[in-house]
Amino acid sequence: MHSIVCFTSDFGTNDGWVGICHAVIYRSCPGVRVVDLAHDIPPFDIRKAAAVAAAGVWQLPDAIHLVVADPGVGGGRRDLVLVTSGGSILVGPDNGVLLPATWRGGGISRAYAIDATRIGFHAPLATFHARDVLAPAVALLASGVDVVAFGDPVDPSTLVEAPFLPGHREVDSMAAEVIDIDRFGSIRIAVSADDVAANGLDRGRLEVVFGHARIELPFGRTYSDVDEGDPVALIDSSGWLTVAVHLGSACERYAVEPGALVRVRALA
């Protein structure tokens, strides 16, 4: 059994949707603890939801992760249960929102498309799959039901692509995307802590190029490794390479938005 469910969505907290999903889970599995990771994700923002879910798996790998940012709900896309090599379980729509979290969990080991009839739902599905399919599936998983009971296996190569791709090596640099901007204006880049170490980016100074902006800055352990107003590169609490400004906004200073292409290289 899994004792913790991490719940990420773009539902907000004013309309009762989060509470309804909680109630569905508790009704079938009263012993589970549901942790609300984030529900103030901008509506339909699959990229942001994917980033938050990936951080959740990195910090709580042994939990079940329910992730819902689903602009295509009711439109025929699949509902999924994914199991990572590290043992994390992810439940959500097949729109790419789950994939970055699987990278943080060591990759996909098993994937299943949820058959709503196998979890007891027989009415026509419409606009609230989180209540009608995903939350009931999470409750069954938390109760110890094996993932094979939910539907047919899925070839991971057929899943909808992630909203951003992991960084990759290009000659003497790492090329990646800006994942998102945190509320302090720090710029998260799709380069994991492991990739930073493997590519020698955790020593000395770095060059970071955001297309229009070229920055030289130190790689540090924390924001206060530099003076107030100075930039620093570090691994943030979500486990991503991040460009920050001590007591300032890197996003405002460098005019960078999510999705921007980045190149990072170590300076001699």
Where are these regions (language model features)?
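N-terminal glycine-/serine-/threonine-rich phosphate-binding loop
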Residues: 1-76
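Anionic-ligand-binding alpha/beta catalytic cores of soluble enzymes and soluble regulatory domains
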Residues: 121-202
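Conserved active-site and cofactor/substrate-binding residues in soluble primary-metabolism enzymes
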Residues: 16, 20, 29, 44, ...
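Fold-independent oxyanion-binding glycine-rich loops
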Residues: 9-11, 37-39, 68-71, 84-85, ...
